Design a protein with these regions (language model features):
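Feature marking well-ordered beta-strand scaffolds used for ligand recognition
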Residues: 1-344, 353-355
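Short, acidic Ser/Thr/Gly-rich low-complexity loop/linker segments typical of extracellular
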Residues: 347-348, 355-366
Length: 366
């Protein structure tokens, strides 16, 4: 099933997939795919015929996350091997022996996730370094030999992202997202936190203007939630939403902001596109189900979705069904808003049914 999305292409794998990232070079586009037994680099410039350029065999793991800095791919997993580094320029040029490094000298051998900011700082989450908070490394001096800068180790982070000097982290076992000042990498400080609807905060992403944060809880029946974070002393949840299918027990996984929209990999529901132009009124405006064989609760289907290729195409990693290339039609929602008042007193009224004439839809005033 789909809405405002078009299937463009697919590549199957013999092993299950995990996360995905994208890469662009000289007008060509590539999918970087986490596979159970390694890393797959796929040319998706022609999305109807994706072509694998290279496969790097790694330790077997159902968790494999990857990001890029410049022309390098960085990858971790939860089995072994530390930080894996691939020179993508060599892969694309057809080098038969491209650089592939397994660096186990950085203080960790396993991790759950990574993020790389625009300044070339690598953030490692959920590793076997002490409490598994967030280790920080400089990539700019030598991309093949990261330099340790510092660590936030007050508690475990499952995932996170950084904008400027602010780290937004999913403290999954604490049931909150945390806000960390990382301007001094040797002395990061907590500057805010807030609970999430299902207290199992997996992933979070900040809006382009920096005023709103969007989170997922990786449990059955959870929500994608929006928060006003413009005042860290007074963080407010402003709305929450579940995906399109009607199954209330589906699990959301990773959400990412792309302008006025969030694109969320939603396990058995596939991919969801939500209009966030009004964060206090989240509206789903698109979806694509990559997993027809599964529905409801369960860890199958869409693991990751990457929405930032220059073409606008979305890359999706489906655990069982492989790599999907989807074309979204980003469509803004229509909003009907108002205040229902008592005709005599003029006071606002709650719990009043509002029905759209000619449409099978009704709702209640708050």
């Amino acid at each position: 099933q789909s809405l405002n999305t078009t299937f463009l292409g697919q590549r199957s794998y013999s092993e299950e997939l995990s996360d995905i990232w994208g890469y662009e070079k000289a007008g060509s586009e590539y999918a970087l795919v986490g596979v159970y037994n390694g890393i797959s680099v796929v040319d998706v410039t022609n999305p109807s015929t994706p072509v694998e350029l290279a496969f790097f065999i790694g330790y077997e793991s159902i968790w494999r996350d990857l990001k890029t800095w410049g022309d390098y791919l960085y990858c971790i997993n939860e089995s072994n091997g530390g930080l894996q580094i691939v020179n993508l320029t060599e892969v694309i040029s057809g080098d038969l022996n491209p650089t592939y490094i397994e660096n186990t000298d950085l203080g960790f051998t396993t991790a759950h996730n990574i993020f790389i900011d625009k300044s070339g700082v690598l953030y490692v989450f959920g590793s076997n370094y002490s409490n598994g908070g967030c280790e920080m490394y400089d990539l700019t001096t030598d991309p093949e030999n990261p330099i340790f800068l510092g660590v936030f180790d007050d508690y475990y982070f499952h995932d996170g992202m950084v904008r400027g000097d602010t780290l937004w982290g999913g403290a999954i076992y604490g049931g909150v997202f945390s806000v960390i000042d990382v301007s001094d990498k040797s002395n990061p400080e907590i500057i805010g936190s807030h609970s999430t609807p299902n207290t199992f905060s997996h992933n979070c992403w900040i809006s382009d203007d920096g005023d709103y944060l969007f989170t997922t809880d990786e449990v059955s029946g959870a929500y994608v939630a929006a928060y006003d974070v413009s005042d860290l002393d007074n963080i407010q949840e402003v709305d929450r939403i579940q995906a399109w299918s009607g199954y209330t027990d589906v699990i959301p996984h990773n959400t990412h902001v792309d302008g006025d929209f969030i694109v969320t990999s939603y396990y058995r529901d596939g991919v969801s596109v939500v209009d966030i132009s009004n964060p206090s009124n989240l509206i789903e405006v698109g979806y694509y189900d990559t997993s027809d064989d599964f529905s409801g609760n369960g860890f199958n289907g869409a693991w990751g979705a990457y929405p930032w290729l220059p073409s606008g195409n979305i890359l999706v990693s489906d655990i069982e069904n492989g790599l999907f290339i989807i074309e979204p039609k980003y469509t803004n929602a229509s909003f009907l808003e108002g205040i229902i008042t008592d005709a005599i007193t003029g006071a606002p009224m709650s719990n009043v049914m509002v029905q759209i004439v000619g449409a099978n839809y009704s709702s209640y005033s708050e």
